[in-house]
């Protein structure tokens, strides 16, 4: 099936499958049934089978799923069988935290550059990458093969910076700014609004507290 036809809900579950299957491999588990997967994933076994059937199924009736094979195949679907070079725009607390996160490289995401407008930060090294100034960005992108930019800027700077990234060939933006970016159709954006996640947590906590007061 063409992956463009697959629902966003399915795509958002794939990293969870991948993470859990990786944990199973670390524990030495070689095979697992859809029922066992459903318990951990908190979705029905039927839903798991439907999700995986979008990509060919991968299971065998009466056997379940080969954990190593399924882990490898989902990794390929997620594009984790290749290295993606990534730059970080904004070297504040969040940008530095992303730059220091070692798990990215284990998943094939290599941070190759960090940029900021603050001259005080220029030249500071984070895991081997010296912070560069934003006016160096266009030439850097011409000279280097970069697929992804993580945007960790204030809201008022994000749109202009996103336009600069697009103009210089970036096709995927991981956006942590507090707005939804408007980009051309051929540019992929993943918006990560941390405050919205916290508000959902607050809602669920409020529901829990209200329910247990009854």
Regions found by a protein language model. Name each.
Residues 1-30:
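Extreme N-terminal segment that seeds HTH/winged-HTH DNA-binding domains in transcriptional regulators
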Residues 22-26, 127-214:
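Phosphate-bearing ligand-interacting subdomains
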Residues 31, 35, 40-83:
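HTH-adjacent hinge/linker in prokaryotic transcriptional regulators
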Residues 91-92:
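Glycine-rich Rossmann-fold phosphate-binding loop(s) that bind the pyrophosphate
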Residues 95:
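N-terminal Rossmann-fold NAD(P) dinucleotide-binding loop
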Residues 105-127:
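NAD(P)-binding Rossmann-fold cofactor-contacting core
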């Amino acid at each position: 099936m063409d992956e463009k036809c697959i629902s966003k809900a399915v795509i958002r579950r794939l990293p969870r499958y991948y993470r859990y299957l990786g944990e199973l491999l670390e524990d030495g588990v070689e095979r697992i049934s859809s029922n066992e997967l459903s318990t951990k994933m908190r979705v029905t076994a039927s839903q798991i089978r439907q999700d995986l059937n979008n990509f060919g199924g991968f299971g065998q009736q009466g056997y379940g799923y080969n954990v190593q094979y399924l882990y490898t195949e989902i990794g390929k679907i997620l594009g984790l069988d290749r290295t993606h070079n990534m730059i970080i725009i904004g070297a504040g607390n969040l940008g530095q935290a992303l730059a220091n996160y070692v798990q990215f490289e284990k998943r094939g995401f290599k941070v190759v550059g960090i940029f900021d407008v603050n001259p005080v930060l220029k030249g500071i090294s984070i895991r081997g990458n010296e912070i560069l100034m934003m006016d160096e960005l266009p030439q850097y992108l011409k000279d280097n093969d970069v697929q992804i930019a993580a945007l960790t800027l204030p809201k008022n700077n994000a749109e202009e910076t996103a336009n600069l990234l697009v103009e210089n060939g970036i096709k995927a933006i991981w956006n942590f700014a507090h707005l939804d970016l408007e980009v051309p159709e051929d540019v992929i954006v993943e918006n990560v609004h941390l405050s919205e996640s916290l508000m959902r947590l607050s809602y669920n906590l409020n529901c829990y507290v209200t329910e247990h007061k009854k």
